[in-house]
Amino acid sequence: MPLDFTAIDFETANNSAASACSVGLVKVRGGRVVDTAYWLIKPPLGYDAFLEWNVRIHGIMQVDVADALLWSEQLPDLIAFAENDHMVAHNAGFDMGVIAAASAASFVPSPSYDYLCSLQVARKTYHLDSYRLPVAAMAAGFEDFTHHNALADAQACAAIIVHAAGRHGASDIAELAELTGSRMGHLGMAVAEVLR
């Protein structure tokens, strides 16, 4: 199989994983970026407060998402973009948790994805003082990006995976996970499980 995947990154309005306020997506085919997408999201009601700390990090304010579609309205676009790809994200547990929590808060089924964490892959690929996204991306040759912009972060994540696959001689995501000893995760919880 070729190195095909979708990299994803979310920014949130507050400390709830359900409060997605932006998403960046990067489609990779054969180790090359072939498409990108970015949009703002109006967080689900009850999860829509924008905390000052989060705004300082990503710069997105409540007024910015006033005309954005809700998670439930945008989830079909996310699914259509990602198709049946493996997903990758830096600290993937967070980003997959956003999908699950925002879906649960919106009373829509969470999509099902197998995923790989670029943070885990970076730890098995590079010898760095820190594995934060900007540092790991620099090791992969992806520099000077706007950290905490969801699209830029997804592009950095994609660059890490492509570079790491080259270093390890991996032809696809599953082989990269195996060669680095990184665990493939699976998203696909029922709504009730997320709300517990």
Short names for language-model regions:
Residues M1-A101, A105-S106, S110-S112, H127-S130, ...:
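Conserved non-catalytic scaffold segment of RNase H-like nuclease domains
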Residues F10-T12, S118, C157:
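Ser/Thr-centric signal marking residues that sit
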Residues P109-A122:
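Conserved beta-strand -> loop -> alpha-helix junction used to position metal-binding or nucleic-acid-contacting
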Residues N149-A164:
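Acidic, divalent-metal-coordinating active-site segment for phosphoryl/phosphodiester hydrolysis
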Residues I160-R196:
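Acidic two-metal-ion nuclease catalytic site recognized across multiple nuclease folds
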